[in-house]
Each structure stands twice: as C-alpha cells, then as structure tokens.
C-alpha cells in the first residue's frame, strides 16, 4: 500500500466525500476511518470531541503513513481542525457548507441550510452566511435524526419516507430554491430528500469542492508526483487499496456489505485510550 488518503467521519457520511475524491484520484490508496462508537458528534462536548478525534486520527496517520487527512464531517470540521493541524505535519482538509455557491445559484434569493443542530448554531456557519449570502434570506434547519436515518439506510436499505416527510415539512414550507446539505451524511439520502422536496429545490453539497482542494494540496506538497507513479502502476493491475476502520464494538452485516461493495478489502475495528 502506498501512502493513502485518509478520510475521517463519525459515520458513513464521509463515503460521499471519498467517492468524489476517487473521481479525481481513482488509483490512489484510501483509508476510511469512521468513529461510529461516538456517533452523532453533534451531541458531544467540544473538548471530548477534540480529544477523541485527535487521538484516533493521529494514531491512524502514524500507522498508515497517510499523506493527507480529509475531515469529512461538518461538525468535526468546525471544532477539531485547529487541533488536528497542530498535531500533524501533513495537510488537513475540512468541510465547508456550500453557502457561497448556493447564494450565487439562487434565483429567488431564498436558500436554506440543512445540517446538524451543532453546525447550525456555530458562529462559523453564521459567519459564512454573513460573508457570502448577505443578499439572501437564509433558513437554517438543524436535524440529528436525519444522520441516523442515513446510517439506517446504508445498513438496511430501508428509509421511512413518512418520517422523512415530517422532518422536512419546515423545509418545504420555507419555499426555497436551493438547499445546502450541510452534513456529509445527507448526500447518501439525496434521492429521498429530492423526492420529498420536489424538483424545484436544488440540493448542493461540498463533495466536489473538497476533492478539488485535495488535488490542489497534494500538488503543492509534491505528493502528486507520487500519485502519478501510483496511477501508472495501478492502471496495469486495475485496482487500488481500500481500508476501512471503525470504533464501535461491531457493525451490522448490511454495513459490512456496503463497505465491501464500495471496494474496501480490509474492514477493521480500532480502539483508542481517549
């Protein structure tokens, strides 16, 4: 395994970000770390969240010799990034809600942000709105239950559409033309969200922008030279190495199947003392 790209989230939402990165770097090696023992992150005290994330990520970076870390979690990105960057010598990329492109795309100038309550209430989010959407009416919707519904869908293939419609009723009533998906879990249920909200609402997430940032940073750090070498080798054999790591005592058979279908050949539980 060459130096991997490490993607980190509390659950399976980061798979949506990993998929976007793989479109740009299809022959790279990847590690996916999901801290499902502490899901959802939005309900944790900030210092507890920071200590746990730093311990987990730094341990796995040392173990795998990762060349970049992607924090594919909006909650962790607003809380943990400074501590991770202080403890790591490699680039660390976070997630930024797509407020700016949403404001630029909106014709009605009525946009919304659907995220966890933690992301909705943080000063960073309101700063983005003030900076990039001051000409828009912005509605904020915080919902942790959608995170667990996305996890449930991936694990079982099932989605309670009646409950989803109830949760999205305030979004429908707001009469928006663009809705920002401010949690990386939400692209995993984008089809269901679109079904409830209708074709008149454009859904936007940050996956493509994150992938672009990863490529830029790898280029600046000269890691892209290594990536080209790996690409040439992988084109000959037609595969890349994919490893998944989780923190819960066990994961469901359905989730294991999903990870295998995504290309992960190694699925392993890891623990930390923090």
Curated annotation (Swiss-Prot):
One GO BP annotation of this record: cell wall organization
Record Gene3D superfamilies: 3.40.50.1860
GO MF term list: glutamate racemase activity
Catalysed conversion reaction: L-glutamate = D-glutamate
Active site positions: 73, 183
Keywords, alphabetical: Cell shape, Cell wall biogenesis/degradation, Isomerase, Peptidoglycan synthesis
EC number: 5.1.1.3
Chain sites annotated for binding substrate: 9-10, 41-42, 74-75, 184-185
HAMAP family associated with the record: Glu_racemase
Sequence similarity: Belongs to the aspartate/glutamate racemases family.
PANTHER family referenced in this protein's UniProt entry, alphabetically: GLUTAMATE RACEMASE (PTHR21198:SF2)
Function of the protein: Provides the (R)-glutamate required for cell wall biosynthesis.
Entry protein name: Glutamate racemase
Lineage, opening ranks: Bacteria, Pseudomonadati, Pseudomonadota, Gammaproteobacteria, Alteromonadales
